From Swiss-Prot:
There is a cross-link at K126, K129, K143, K211, K332, K354, K368, K372, K452, K463, K475, K478 (Glycyl lysine isopeptide (Lys-Gly) (interchain with G-Cter in SUMO2)). InterPro entries: Nab1_C, NAB_co-repressor_dom, NAB_fam, Nab_N, NCD2_sf. This is NGFI-A-binding protein 1. Residues 220-309 are annotated as: NCD2. It comes from Mesocricetus auratus.
Length: 485
């Protein structure tokens, strides 16, 4: 089975590693799965590495996996073992500035390309030098091919570790290209798109900032000898001086400045790189900001927040636009399954309304019951009061009948009692009896409605009571024998 040949620089590096591990049979599988980036294999965690091994069909052969791991470790610690003469290969996955200096494809950096390219851009936007392109010339048949490569971000530079990194990595910063006295910097820099976004944002912000007074700056430098010794020469340079921007970048850096105590090998983050670039651009617009680092830091952070948000949002949208995937936040509703959420909510609201109505009705029934009880209590009290009045009336009747009879017996005062004996005749009975019957009629009318609904027995007792009391009074009277004298 013929092995495919590498076509790019990334594929060539993978080819050399697999060749050293005697695993060239997996080269085609790696290329089919998009595994032409060796750094991805070196940086992958345990789970991700095992997943890659499963994709290329190496997971079932642990000895092959160990040979590949050993080759990757050798490539990280000593990349020189894998350097082979390169042919005319297009650079795709590995940036050219990370090639060793001895590589035939390394031809150095041309800073003049910045002046050539900047003239074709808008005149009011000044492109930073860290976004300058590099020239790459191939060796094929004496013909040169010029290609532009943007400087990669800090995430890629972190992948190159080991003692060979200081030898193989070549800085593209203007400080290394320009003055030899400039501080030593790493290859960390923003890519062209991010640097251009910073320049645009600084251009908008510079129009809103107040213009600094040059006389005040000179007075400040005159009073501060240390500051004047450090940055005084920058204010004496003309704007056409090519080294002025390099010096501004040198002393305007917020993070990782040449006089900072940052540990060697500690790389700057994307935020720190953006802040440094924004500070440099702001100081290029207004040199006086070099003397006010607190204000410069605040403005640079503001630019960094805006640029990072816009750049990340744009990049994310571009990546998401290439995928035809559903949003993870979208609720998936399958066809054929009705949505019961709304009917359940409607039923719940109806049940709540019914329960509220029942509670209101029960409270009303309770109030009506209490009112009925109060009415019954009042009627009972009135009934007892009338009974007491009736007893008093009966007592007065007996007393008055005794007063009119000289021998203690009532005298006859009506014609209807003429047939009765004298001792049974009761005077004033005709006058007093209607009083009781009137009271009886009033009581009947008063308790007729209450007695029908609550107690029918009370009404019978109440109606029969005056008659029984009257007959009882008649029965109490005893007849006395007539005196024979």
């Amino acid at each position: 089975m013929a092995t495919a040949l590498p076509r790019t620089l990334g594929e060539l590096q993978l080819y050399r590693i697999l060749q050293k591990a005697n695993l060239l049979s997996y080269f085609g599988a790696f290329i089919q799965q998009g595994g032409d980036d060796v750094q991805q294999l070196c940086e992958a965690g345990e789970e991700e590495f095992l997943e890659i091994m499963a994709l290329v069909g190496m997971a079932s052969k642990p000895l092959h996996v160990r040979r590949l791991q050993k080759a990757l470790r050798d490539w990280v610690t000593n990349p020189g073992l894998f350097n082979q003469p390169l042919t005319s290969l297009p650079v795709s996955s590995i940036p050219i500035y990370k090639l060793p200096k001895g590589s035939p494809t390394w031809l150095g950096i041309s800073c003049n390309s910045y002046e050539r390219n900047s003239s074709a851009r808008e005149p009011h936007l000044k492109i930073p030098k860290c976004a300058a392109t590099t020239c790459v010339q191939s060796l094929g048949q004496g013909k040169s091919e010029v290609g532009s490569l943007a400087v990669q971000s800090v995430s890629e530079s972190r992948l190159w570790q080991g003692h060979h990194a200081t030898e193989s990595e070549h800085s593209l910063s203007p400080a290394d290209v320009g003055s030899p006295a400039s501080p030593k910097e790493s290859s960390e820099a923003l890519d062209a798109a991010a640097a251009l976004s910073v320049a645009e944002c600084v251009e908008r912000m510079a129009s809103t900032l107040p213009k600094s007074d040059l006389n005040e700056v000179k007075e400040l430098l005159k009073n501060n000898k240390k500051l004047a010794k450090m940055i005084g020469h920058i204010f004496e340079m003309s704007d056409e001086d090519p080294h002025k921007e390099e010096e501004i970048r040198k002393y305007s850096a917020i993070y990782g400045r040449f006089d900072s105590k940052r540990k060697d090998g500690k790389h700057l983050t994307l935020h720190e790189l953006t802040v440094n670039e924004a500070a440099a651009q702001l100081c290029v617009k207004d040199n006086a900001l070099l003397t006010r680092r607190d204000e410069l830091f605040a403005l640079a952070r503001q630019v960094s927040r805006e640029v990072t948000y816009k750049y990340t949002y744009r990049t994310t949208r571009l990546k998401c636009g290439e995928r035809d995937e559903l949003s993870p936040k979208r609720i998936k509703v399958e066809d054929g399954f009705p949505d019961f959420q709304e009917p359940v909510q409607t039923l719940f609201q109806q049940a709540r309304a019914k329960s509220e109505e029942l509670a209101a009705l029960s409270s009303q029934q309770t109030e009506k019951g209490m009112a009925k009880q109060m009415e019954l209590l009042c009627a009972q009290a009135s009934y007892e009061r009338l009974q007491q009045e009736r007893r008093l009336t009966a007592g007065l009747y007996r007393q008055s009948s005794g007063e009119h009879s000289p021998d203690g017996l009532p005298s006859d005062g009506s014609d209807g009692q003429g047939e009765r004996p004298l001792n049974l005749r009761m005077p004033n009975v005709q006058n007093r009896q209607p009083h009781h019957f009137v009271a009886d009629g009033e009581l009947s009318r008063l308790y007729s409605s209450e007695a029908k609904s609550h107690s029918s027995e009370n009404l019978g007792i109440l109606k029969d009571y005056p008659h029984s009391a009257f007959t009882l009074e008649k029965k109490v009277i005893k007849t006395e024998p007539e005196d024979s004298r």
